[in-house]
Protein backbone atom coordinates (compact mmCIF):
# COMPACT_ATOMS: atom_id res chain seq x y z
CA UNK A 1 0.00 0.00 0.00
CA UNK A 2 1.31 3.44 -0.92
CA UNK A 3 2.14 5.76 1.95
CA UNK A 4 -0.27 8.65 2.55
CA UNK A 5 0.93 11.42 4.88
CA UNK A 6 -0.99 13.52 7.38
CA UNK A 7 -2.29 16.54 5.46
CA UNK A 8 -1.73 18.76 8.51
CA UNK A 9 2.02 18.14 8.26
CA UNK A 10 2.41 17.94 4.49
CA UNK A 11 4.63 20.40 2.65
CA UNK A 12 2.79 22.83 0.41
CA UNK A 13 3.64 23.00 -3.30
CA UNK A 14 6.25 25.76 -2.87
CA UNK A 15 7.98 24.05 0.06
CA UNK A 16 8.03 20.67 -1.72
CA UNK A 17 9.45 22.32 -4.85
CA UNK A 18 12.18 24.02 -2.82
CA UNK A 19 13.17 20.84 -0.97
CA UNK A 20 13.50 18.92 -4.23
CA UNK A 21 15.16 21.70 -6.22
CA UNK A 22 17.73 22.57 -3.55
CA UNK A 23 19.35 19.17 -4.07
CA UNK A 24 19.25 19.24 -7.88
CA UNK A 25 22.59 20.50 -9.27
CA UNK A 26 22.14 23.03 -12.04
CA UNK A 27 18.59 23.93 -11.03
CA UNK A 28 17.45 27.51 -10.50
CA UNK A 29 16.38 28.12 -6.91
CA UNK A 30 15.32 31.75 -7.27
CA UNK A 31 16.91 35.12 -7.94
CA UNK A 32 19.36 37.30 -6.06
CA UNK A 33 17.78 39.58 -3.48
CA UNK A 34 17.03 42.99 -5.06
CA UNK A 35 18.21 41.72 -8.46
CA UNK A 36 15.54 39.63 -10.23
CA UNK A 37 17.72 39.36 -13.34
CA UNK A 38 20.41 37.24 -11.64
CA UNK A 39 19.45 33.62 -10.85
CA UNK A 40 20.51 31.62 -7.83
CA UNK A 41 21.80 28.29 -9.15
CA UNK A 42 22.40 25.04 -7.27
CA UNK A 43 26.11 24.45 -7.87
CA UNK A 44 26.50 21.08 -6.19
CA UNK A 45 25.86 18.70 -3.32
CA UNK A 46 28.73 18.13 -0.90
CA UNK A 47 29.03 15.27 1.57
CA UNK A 48 30.61 17.06 4.51
CA UNK A 49 30.84 14.10 6.86
CA UNK A 50 29.05 11.08 8.26
CA UNK A 51 27.29 10.80 11.59
CA UNK A 52 26.90 7.81 13.90
CA UNK A 53 23.44 7.37 15.42
CA UNK A 54 23.62 4.04 17.28
CA UNK A 55 20.39 4.57 19.24
CA UNK A 56 18.28 5.34 16.17
CA UNK A 57 16.92 8.33 18.11
CA UNK A 58 17.73 11.66 16.49
CA UNK A 59 17.92 15.16 17.92
CA UNK A 60 17.50 18.03 15.45
CA UNK A 61 17.87 21.22 17.44
CA UNK A 62 20.27 24.02 18.30
CA UNK A 63 23.18 22.60 20.33
CA UNK A 64 22.82 25.44 22.86
CA UNK A 65 20.33 28.15 23.81
CA UNK A 66 21.42 31.72 24.54
CA UNK A 67 18.66 32.00 27.14
CA UNK A 68 20.21 29.17 29.16
CA UNK A 69 23.79 30.48 29.39
CA UNK A 70 23.54 31.27 33.10
CA UNK A 71 22.11 27.82 33.77
CA UNK A 72 24.99 26.22 31.85
CA UNK A 73 27.49 28.11 34.01
CA UNK A 74 25.74 27.09 37.22
CA UNK A 75 25.32 23.48 36.15
CA UNK A 76 21.53 23.71 36.42
CA UNK A 77 19.10 21.57 34.43
CA UNK A 78 17.88 22.92 31.09
CA UNK A 79 15.09 21.96 28.73
CA UNK A 80 15.49 18.62 26.93
CA UNK A 81 16.59 18.73 23.29
CA UNK A 82 14.09 18.46 20.44
CA UNK A 83 14.22 14.76 19.70
CA UNK A 84 12.25 13.67 16.65
CA UNK A 85 9.24 11.45 17.25
CA UNK A 86 10.26 9.30 14.29
CA UNK A 87 13.23 6.98 14.69
CA UNK A 88 15.81 6.18 12.02
CA UNK A 89 17.80 3.01 11.35
CA UNK A 90 20.71 2.84 13.80
CA UNK A 91 24.05 3.22 12.06
CA UNK A 92 26.17 5.64 10.07
CA UNK A 93 24.49 8.19 7.81
CA UNK A 94 25.71 10.87 5.40
CA UNK A 95 25.41 14.60 6.06
CA UNK A 96 25.21 16.66 2.87
CA UNK A 97 25.00 20.37 2.01
CA UNK A 98 23.31 21.88 -1.04
CA UNK A 99 25.41 24.79 -2.32
CA UNK A 100 24.09 27.67 -4.41
CA UNK A 101 25.64 30.71 -6.09
CA UNK A 102 24.07 34.03 -6.96
CA UNK A 103 26.70 36.67 -7.83
CA UNK A 104 26.01 40.23 -6.70
CA UNK A 105 27.62 43.64 -6.36
CA UNK A 106 27.76 45.67 -3.16
CA UNK A 107 29.19 49.20 -3.09
CA UNK A 108 31.17 48.46 -6.23
CA UNK A 109 32.62 45.18 -4.92
CA UNK A 110 31.70 41.87 -6.57
CA UNK A 111 30.83 38.75 -4.57
CA UNK A 112 30.21 35.16 -5.72
CA UNK A 113 27.15 34.81 -3.50
CA UNK A 114 27.94 31.22 -2.50
CA UNK A 115 25.47 30.05 0.14
CA UNK A 116 24.28 26.88 1.84
CA UNK A 117 20.67 26.35 0.75
CA UNK A 118 19.94 23.33 2.94
CA UNK A 119 21.54 20.54 4.95
CA UNK A 120 20.29 16.98 4.88
CA UNK A 121 20.81 13.70 6.67
CA UNK A 122 20.72 10.97 4.04
CA UNK A 123 19.13 7.82 5.42
CA UNK A 124 18.75 5.96 2.11
CA UNK A 125 18.88 6.53 -1.64
CA UNK A 126 15.23 5.54 -2.15
CA UNK A 127 13.12 8.11 -4.05
CA UNK A 128 11.15 10.60 -1.95
CA UNK A 129 7.47 10.89 -2.91
CA UNK A 130 6.35 13.35 -0.23
CA UNK A 131 7.54 15.79 2.42
CA UNK A 132 6.14 16.27 5.91
CA UNK A 133 7.13 18.37 8.90
CA UNK A 134 8.91 16.31 11.53
CA UNK A 135 7.30 16.32 14.96
CA UNK A 136 9.27 16.28 18.18
CA UNK A 137 8.54 13.67 20.83
CA UNK A 138 6.63 16.28 22.83
CA UNK A 139 4.63 17.66 19.89
CA UNK A 140 0.96 16.78 19.42
CA UNK A 141 -0.36 17.12 15.88
CA UNK A 142 -3.90 17.41 17.23
CA UNK A 143 -2.97 20.69 18.94
CA UNK A 144 -1.44 22.35 15.89
CA UNK A 145 -3.22 25.52 14.82
CA UNK A 146 -3.90 26.12 11.10
CA UNK A 147 -0.70 27.38 9.50
CA UNK A 148 1.42 26.53 12.55
CA UNK A 149 4.76 24.87 11.76
CA UNK A 150 6.49 22.75 14.43
CA UNK A 151 10.17 23.71 14.43
CA UNK A 152 13.25 24.37 16.52
CA UNK A 153 14.65 27.82 17.29
CA UNK A 154 18.19 29.16 17.38
CA UNK A 155 19.42 32.64 18.30
CA UNK A 156 22.88 31.60 17.08
CA UNK A 157 21.56 30.58 13.63
CA UNK A 158 22.76 26.99 13.92
CA UNK A 159 21.21 23.56 14.23
CA UNK A 160 22.55 20.06 14.64
CA UNK A 161 21.90 16.39 14.05
CA UNK A 162 22.86 14.28 17.06
CA UNK A 163 22.30 10.89 18.63
CA UNK A 164 19.75 11.46 21.39
CA UNK A 165 21.22 8.78 23.60
CA UNK A 166 24.54 10.61 23.84
CA UNK A 167 23.15 14.16 23.84
CA UNK A 168 24.57 15.30 27.19
CA UNK A 169 28.15 14.47 26.22
CA UNK A 170 27.85 15.57 22.59
CA UNK A 171 26.33 18.98 23.37
CA UNK A 172 28.68 19.76 26.28
CA UNK A 173 31.37 21.59 24.22
CA UNK A 174 28.74 24.08 23.00
CA UNK A 175 27.47 24.72 26.52
CA UNK A 176 30.77 25.72 28.14
CA UNK A 177 30.63 29.40 29.14
CA UNK A 178 32.53 31.65 31.53
CA UNK A 179 31.12 35.02 32.55
CA UNK A 180 28.61 34.71 29.73
CA UNK A 181 31.31 34.19 27.10
CA UNK A 182 31.68 30.89 25.19
CA UNK A 183 34.77 28.91 26.13
CA UNK A 184 36.79 27.91 23.02
CA UNK A 185 35.55 24.46 22.10
CA UNK A 186 37.52 21.54 20.77
CA UNK A 187 35.39 20.35 17.89
CA UNK A 188 36.24 18.98 14.47
CA UNK A 189 35.89 21.74 11.87
CA UNK A 190 34.15 20.67 8.67
CA UNK A 191 33.30 22.32 5.33
CA UNK A 192 30.40 24.75 5.20
CA UNK A 193 30.96 26.10 8.74
CA UNK A 194 29.92 22.73 10.15
CA UNK A 195 31.42 21.15 13.25
CA UNK A 196 31.44 17.59 14.60
CA UNK A 197 31.72 16.21 18.13
CA UNK A 198 32.41 12.52 18.76
CA UNK A 199 31.58 10.39 21.79
CA UNK A 200 33.74 7.32 21.35
CA UNK A 201 32.39 5.68 24.50
CA UNK A 202 28.98 5.43 22.82
CA UNK A 203 30.18 5.51 19.18
CA UNK A 204 27.89 8.49 18.60
CA UNK A 205 28.25 11.91 16.96
CA UNK A 206 26.82 15.42 16.74
CA UNK A 207 27.13 17.51 13.57
CA UNK A 208 26.37 21.23 13.72
CA UNK A 209 25.25 23.17 10.61
CA UNK A 210 23.96 26.63 9.69
CA UNK A 211 20.24 27.33 10.09
CA UNK A 212 18.99 30.91 10.21
CA UNK A 213 16.94 31.24 13.43
CA UNK A 214 16.45 27.46 13.44
CA UNK A 215 13.89 25.91 11.14
CA UNK A 216 11.32 23.29 10.26
CA UNK A 217 12.64 19.73 10.12
CA UNK A 218 11.42 18.16 6.88
CA UNK A 219 11.08 14.39 6.49
CA UNK A 220 11.31 13.00 2.98
CA UNK A 221 9.16 9.86 2.86
CA UNK A 222 9.31 6.99 0.36
CA UNK A 223 6.33 5.19 -1.18
CA UNK A 224 6.39 2.77 1.75
CA UNK A 225 6.47 5.60 4.30
CA UNK A 226 10.09 5.12 5.33
CA UNK A 227 12.17 8.23 6.00
CA UNK A 228 14.79 8.53 3.27
CA UNK A 229 16.13 11.97 4.14
CA UNK A 230 15.83 14.67 6.79
CA UNK A 231 16.31 18.28 5.66
CA UNK A 232 16.73 21.64 7.35
CA UNK A 233 16.99 24.68 5.09
CA UNK A 234 19.50 27.42 5.86
CA UNK A 235 16.87 30.14 5.94
CA UNK A 236 18.55 32.29 3.29
CA UNK A 237 16.40 35.02 1.66
CA UNK A 238 13.68 33.59 -0.54
CA UNK A 239 13.62 30.21 1.17
CA UNK A 240 10.21 28.61 0.69
CA UNK A 241 10.63 25.74 3.15
Please describe what each predicted stretch is:
Residues 1-241:
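N-terminal domain-onset segments
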Amino acid sequence: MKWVGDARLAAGPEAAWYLETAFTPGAYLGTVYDDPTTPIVVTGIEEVTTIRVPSGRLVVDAPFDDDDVSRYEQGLPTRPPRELAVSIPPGVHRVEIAWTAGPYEFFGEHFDGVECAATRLRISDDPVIGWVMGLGVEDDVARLQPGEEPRFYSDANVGCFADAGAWTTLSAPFRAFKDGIPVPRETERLPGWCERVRDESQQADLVMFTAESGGVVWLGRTKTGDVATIVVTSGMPGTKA
